[in-house]
């Protein structure tokens, strides 16, 4: 073990073009609240951090690839049909990867992109 405390995962970060638009999106749909607002970086409840694309590109020196499908944010919701109604009424332009489907193990899920092409899955509890 390094030092006296065990390392732990603190946050996960997604890159966004418009941090305020993204904050509103995650607040509206998932009830996440802003905890920290730094210039171009925002931490929301449940460990989600938002980083403005212009700063991220500067840090990495690489282009951001929306809809890369290399990872997803996963949420669970018992009332998935109610969530879909909320999603479609608040964000009718949402781009689906797959509409409501049921996996072979019985879990209902939907997948869609946030406004910046980050993949989101919402499923019934496993």
Protein language model regions, located:
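Short amphipathic alpha-helices within nucleic acid-binding modules
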Residues: 25, 81-87
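N-terminal beta-strand motif that seeds the catalytic metal site of vicinal oxygen chelate
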Residues: 1-21, 71-73
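Short beta-strand micro-motifs in enzyme catalytic cores
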Residues: 42, 71, 106-110
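Helix N-cap motif at beta-to-alpha junctions
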Residues: 18-19, 78-80
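Vicinal oxygen chelate
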Residues: 2-5, 85-126
């Amino acid at each position: 073990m390094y030092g006296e405390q065990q390392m732990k995962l603190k946050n996960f970060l997604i890159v966004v073009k418009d941090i305020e638009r993204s904050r509103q999106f995650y607040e509206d749909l998932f009830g996440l609240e802003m905890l920290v607002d730094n210039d171009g970086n925002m931490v929301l409840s449940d460990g989600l951090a938002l980083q403005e694309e212009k700063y991220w590109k500067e840090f990495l020196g690489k282009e951001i690839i929306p809809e890369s499908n290399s990872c997803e944010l996963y949420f669970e919701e018992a009332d998935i049909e109610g969530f879909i109604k909320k999603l479609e009424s608040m964000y009718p332009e949402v781009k689906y990867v797959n509409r409501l489907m049921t996996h072979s193990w019985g879990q209902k899920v939907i997948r869609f992109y946030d406004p910046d092409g980050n993949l989101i899955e919402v499923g019934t509890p496993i």
